Amino acid sequence: MPTPITPAMITALMTGYRSDFQAGMSMAPSQYKKIAMTVPSTSKSNTYGWLGQFPQFREWIGSRVIEKMKAYGYAIVNKTFEGTVAINRDDFEDDNLGIYSPLFQEMGRAAAAQPDELVFAALRDGINAACYDGQNFFDTEHPVYPKVDGSGDAQMVSNMFVAKTGSVGAQADYSGPAWYLLDCSRAIKPLIYQDRRKAELVAQTKVDEGRAFTDNEFVFGASARRNVGYGFWQMAYMMQSPLTLDALWHGWSAMREFTADG
């Protein structure tokens, strides 16, 4: 005889699956925090007008020196991500629910792993995606102005290097995988992870509504609102070259010369 479905059983089911979901989230150790700063978001998007300004201290002599900084309009719009699964009502009635625990654990693991996937994909795609100055994050022509208000003739600065291969007269760009030098020693990191709403598990489990009524199944879904973007290009250098000590020194030396406006 099928087990009657009661509100108490639905509550117990959700408690168990939420526990599985949380357990799955702990299975995905994060790496993204090493290269991206986490910024909480409370709206549809965040605008990072302060990008381009490097905070620095000077000796306080007389009045404070207040300089009008160039304001940038770089914005990151939050995106909603989801994952949804369905459980057959017959399995619920037949008390055959333990088989779904690994599914909810994997859903939790996927939710926790996604920030890594987003951040490292943004790093890879930085050669084709714009940062705060309007240039691609990895670019050969980042404008650096002589004054902090963005006035004057800009000097073009590159934060990428593409090696040449082949013999003289028949050279071509290196086509192997790129690697990256990142300055992650500061509070501000090269990339931005924007967190609007953390991953949560919800369910549609009323027996006389939705898919339980039309398709004989209960629906469970996880969702989160988040997105990624780019911080200071000065903190990153892309090397399209073999990984050698000479190439490493080239990139490190170039990064030491980077400055902001002014």
What are these regions (language model features)?
Residues 2-5, 141-262:
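Sequence/fold signature of self-assembling virion shell proteins
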Residues 7, 20, 69-70, 205:
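Short alpha-helical segments and helix-capping/turn motifs at coil-helix boundaries
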Residues 74-128, 216-224:
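Long, contiguous amphipathic alpha-helices that act as assembly "spine/axial" helices in icosahedral shell
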Residues 5, 9, 73, 91-99, ...:
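Conserved aromatic-histidine-acidic binding/catalytic patches
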Residues 124-140:
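Short, conserved secondary-structure transition motifs
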Residues 1-28:
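N-terminal alpha-helical "arm" segments
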Residues 23-79:
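Assembly/oligomerization interface modules of large self-assembling protein complexes
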Residues 7, 18, 78, 245-248:
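Alpha-helix initiation and N-capping motif
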